[in-house]
């Protein structure tokens, strides 16, 4: 097993064959030896390979219009939000790749705030971005966070979710995206600082500051404080992109008051402000509005890009039902297709479903529960029936709970509750 020089009986390198007299150091392994020269050569080869991968990664960043185009496949509407997100994400990863070179100008990080009503697509936009860029992605809920030392989740647990999403590859996690949902719930109760401790509001904002800006954080691999002796994972958040989203209920009133102050007086165009629809005020949001809402100035400063999403109208919800690659109608059609049944939704049925979602104020998120209620009896009965080959969902199915129209192979109409008896 051991490599000896036949003449002198000396140990020699198992790779290059040089004896221990010909090299500075010989490292022993189980039955093999490697010299310092071979170690240096192997290190250079590995570094060259890693350098090649990094160059490929730089070339693979999609352009903003390409990112926006892919977002269009999954998210309906919200054009301005898509544009601002595409540019921000492109610049963020361009900045990361430029940091490997020695540059005179240092580019700062641009975290993003998404403001929009529930079900408008905030989370879906962030998820789709992570899928496009093929980077680790984690979703955190701000409502469960508390200041360190209090019952609840520490802010470091957000980073643990990202590390887990990267399969504990810290280097990969350091280039990931974190979406913090319900960020409006950590707003302090009033615009003015309070003398009482606000551990789940302003305290959380203070705790998030360094992570948002970029710091080396110590993350407990098992989470929480139950294992005080565990070794901590060190992660640098300088290149982690943070997207904070929330409904910010009540901020429209703050924006209205600010706009109202500017139009008081003679010769002002009051009608111009009155033309704005309820959801359109969000597009006028400024950092000062977030300050009045209850976010602290330091927190707002670390989220420089503010993008608003408008409430979805009936037409947009109908498009969401039918157009995206993972549209709900396509999903249910596929489910029934597996039972050899063709599913059809009439135009009036789609509009009634959309109107019901608007009435419930659940946005796109509420569409599935509405369709599930309509389709329950259909999906219960159809698998056991051999006579029905087509199912038509019409408007009355949504508004009056009427049964859908079933058709046989020869075009005969069937009833859902009374299966046709076979001869």
From Swiss-Prot:
Residues 1-54 form the ClpX-type ZB domain. Zn(2+) binds at residues 13, 16, 35, 38. The keyword Metal-binding applies. GO terms for biological process: cell division; proteolysis involved in protein catabolic process. One of its GO terms (molecular function) is ATP hydrolysis activity. Gene3D superfamilies: 1.10.8.60, ClpX chaperone, C4-type zinc finger domain, P-loop containing nucleotide triphosphate hydrolases. It comes from the Bacteria. GO terms for cellular component: HslUV protease complex. Keywords: ATP-binding, Chaperone, Metal-binding, Nucleotide-binding, Zinc. Belongs to the ClpX chaperone family. Component of the ClpX-ClpP complex. Forms a hexameric ring that, in the presence of ATP, binds to fourteen ClpP subunits assembled into a disk-like structure with a central cavity, resembling the structure of eukaryotic proteasomes. ATP-dependent specificity component of the Clp protease. It directs the protease to specific substrates. Can perform chaperone functions in the absence of ClpP. This is ATP-dependent Clp protease ATP-binding subunit ClpX. It comes from Shouchella clausii (strain KSM-K16) (Alkalihalobacillus clausii). The gene is clpX.
């Amino acid at each position: 097993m051991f490599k000896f020089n036949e003449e002198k009986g000396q140990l020699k390198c198992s790779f290059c064959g040089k004896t221990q007299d010909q090299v500075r150091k010989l490292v022993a392994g189980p039955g093999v030896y490697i010299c310092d020269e071979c170690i240096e050569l192997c290190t250079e080869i590995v570094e060259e390979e890693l350098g090649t991968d990094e160059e490929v990664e730089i070339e693979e960043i999609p352009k903003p219009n390409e990112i926006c185009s892919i977002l269009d496949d999954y998210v309906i509407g919200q054009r301005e939000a898509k544009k601002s997100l595409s540019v921000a994400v492109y610049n963020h990863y361009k900045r990361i790749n430029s940091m490997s070179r020695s540059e005179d100008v240092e580019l700062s990080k641009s975290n993003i705030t998404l403001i929009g009503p529930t079900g408008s697509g905030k989370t879906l936009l962030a998820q789709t971005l992570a899928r496009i860029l093929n980077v680790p992605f984690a979703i955190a809920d701000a409502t469960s966070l508390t200041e360190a030392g209090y019952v609840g989740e520490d802010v470091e647990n957000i980073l643990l979710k990202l590390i887990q999403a990267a399969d504990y590859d810290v280097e990969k996690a350091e280039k990931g995206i974190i979406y913090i949902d319900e960020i409006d719930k950590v707003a302090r109760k009033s615009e003015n600082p309070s003398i009482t401790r606000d551990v789940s509001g302003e305290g959380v904002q203070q705790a998030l500051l360094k992570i948002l800006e970029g710091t080396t954080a110590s993350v407990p691999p098992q989470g929480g404080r139950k294992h005080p002796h565990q070794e901590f994972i060190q992660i640098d958040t300088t290149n982690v992109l943070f997207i904070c989203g929330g409904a910010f209920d009540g901020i429209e009133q703050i924006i209205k008051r600010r706009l109202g102050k500017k139009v008081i007086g003679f010769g002002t165009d009051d009608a111009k402000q009155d033309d704005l629809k309820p959801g359109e005020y969000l597009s006028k949001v400024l950092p000062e509005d977030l300050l009045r809402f209850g976010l602290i100035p330091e927190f707002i400063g670390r989220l420089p890009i503010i993008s608003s999403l408008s409430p979805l109208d009936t037409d947009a919800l109908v498009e969401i039902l039918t157009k995206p690659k993972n549209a709900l109608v396509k999903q249910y059609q596929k489910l029934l297709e597996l039972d050899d049944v063709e599913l059809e939704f009439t135009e009036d049925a789609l509009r009634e479903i959309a109107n019901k979602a608007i009435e419930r104020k659940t946005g796109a998120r509420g569409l599935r529960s509405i369709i599930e209620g309509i389709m329950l009896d259909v999906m219960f009965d159809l698998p056991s029936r051999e006579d029905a080959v087509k199912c038509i969902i019409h408007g009355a199915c949504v508004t009056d709970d009427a049964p859908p129209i079933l058709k046989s192979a020869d075009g005969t109409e069937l009833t859902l509750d009374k299966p046709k008896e076979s001869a």
